[in-house]
Amino acid sequence: MLPVNPRDLEKMMRRLGIKVEQLSADEARIVLGSGETMVFRSPTVIVMRAKGQPPMVYLVGDYTVEKPREETAAEITEEDVALVAEQAGVSMEEARKALEESGGDIAEAILRLKGEE
């Protein structure tokens, strides 16, 4: 590659209508379609703008990939099941199923069961 003077490069880009801006950032995150997140720590962020084109953003630096957090299932206790069964007047199995469907929300489970009667 030929050595290029940074000043000359800047002049050439200006003539072409390209503006370059460097930003400082502590962290940059990109959320991927798979749910994973690329985390750049102390990246160099370069924004290039050309006339009539959307800006191009370059992230330069090391990154890590974070896996998506798995939602933990709501903990359903026997006391919750008994309360729902008593309030809705249904069996323990029906009460447990309603609690699982409502994500452990007791009030929602009772309302669902009373609405089904």
UniProtKB/Swiss-Prot annotation:
InterPro entries xrefs: NAC-like_UBA, NAC_A/B_dom_sf, NAC_arc, Nas_poly-pep-assoc_cplx_dom, UBA-like_sf
Organism domain of life: Archaea
Domain NAC-A/B residue range list: 3-72
Keywords assigned: Protein transport, RNA-binding, Transport
GO biological process: protein transport
GO molecular function term, any single one: RNA binding
Protein family membership: Belongs to the NAC-alpha family.
Cross-referenced HAMAP family: NAC_arch
Function according to Swiss-Prot or TrEMBL: Contacts the emerging nascent chain on the ribosome.
Subunit structure, as described in the record: Homodimer. Interacts with the ribosome. Binds ribosomal RNA.
Protein name: Nascent polypeptide-associated complex protein
Name of the gene encoding the protein in the UniProt record: nac
